[in-house]
């Protein structure tokens, strides 16, 4: 009888503690972390927490099959690191550049269109994950790509040595 009473008391205390504490929430990213380049002219924008969350979800849905961890499975020499994006032609190290790429992808040097082999809005009939993405969705994905180096550091795009 005493054991049963102790068990009930312990269970009651633990359940009461759960109600008082509530569920755990993710650490909110500060404004500096959420500030990313908007365009090649140097303007910046601050992503909302909703955009950050949605960007991660959409990236995992539409992009992570080939770009998990910021690498490119089909070409290990070019990833989604800030350096790789900045050296592309046109510069893709900003929201507008990445959104343009997601609409109409080109080779790293910008010379040839590759929409038939890279998912994009232009090739949504082939790559169905891109079908229903809006411009806001593309901006959220671009924002996710641009804040990852600030969150995970050199692991983003680091390749096999990290994963």
Curated annotation (Swiss-Prot):
Q: Where is the signal peptide?
A: 1-26
Q: How, per the record, is the cofactor bound? A: Binds 1 heme c group covalently per subunit.
Annotated Gene Ontology MF terms? electron transfer activity; heme binding; iron ion binding
**Entry's localization field:** Cellular thylakoid membrane
* GO CC terms: photosystem II; plasma membrane-derived thylakoid membrane
Where is it mainly found?
A: membrane
Q: Name one GO biological process term.
A: respiratory electron transport chain
Q: HAMAP family, per this entry?
A: PSII_Cyt550
Can you state the subunit structure given in the record?
PSII is composed of 1 copy each of membrane proteins PsbA, PsbB, PsbC, PsbD, PsbE, PsbF, PsbH, PsbI, PsbJ, PsbK, PsbL, PsbM, PsbT, PsbX, PsbY, PsbZ, Psb30/Ycf12, peripheral proteins PsbO, CyanoQ (PsbQ), PsbU, PsbV and a large number of cofactors. It forms dimeric complexes.
The entry assigns this protein to a family as follows: Belongs to the cytochrome c family. PsbV subfamily.
Q: Name the NCBIfam families for this protein.
A: PS_II_C550
Query: Under what name is this protein listed?
Result: Photosystem II extrinsic protein V
Lineage per the UniProt record: Bacteria, Bacillati, Cyanobacteriota, Cyanophyceae, Nostocales
């Amino acid at each position: 009888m005493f054991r049963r009473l102790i068990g009930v008391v312990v269970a009651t205390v633990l359940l009461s503690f759960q109600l008082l504490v509530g569920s755990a929430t993710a650490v909110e990213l500060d404004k500096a972390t959420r500030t990313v380049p908007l365009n090649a002219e140097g303007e910046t924008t601050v992503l909302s927490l909703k955009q950050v969350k949605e960007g991660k979800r959409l990236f995992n849905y539409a992009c992570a099959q080939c770009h998990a961890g910021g690498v490119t499975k089909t070409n290990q020499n070019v990833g989604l690191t800030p350096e790789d994006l900045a050296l592309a032609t046109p510069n893709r190290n900003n929201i507008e550049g990445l959104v343009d790429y997601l609409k109409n992808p080109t080779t790293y040097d910008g010379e040839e269109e590759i929409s038939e082999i890279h998912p994009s809005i232009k090739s949504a009939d082939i790559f169905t994950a891109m079908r229903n993405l809006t411009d806001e969705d593309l901006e959220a994905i671009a924002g996710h790509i641009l804040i990852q180096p600030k969150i995970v550091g050199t692991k983003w795009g680091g390749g096999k040595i990290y994963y």
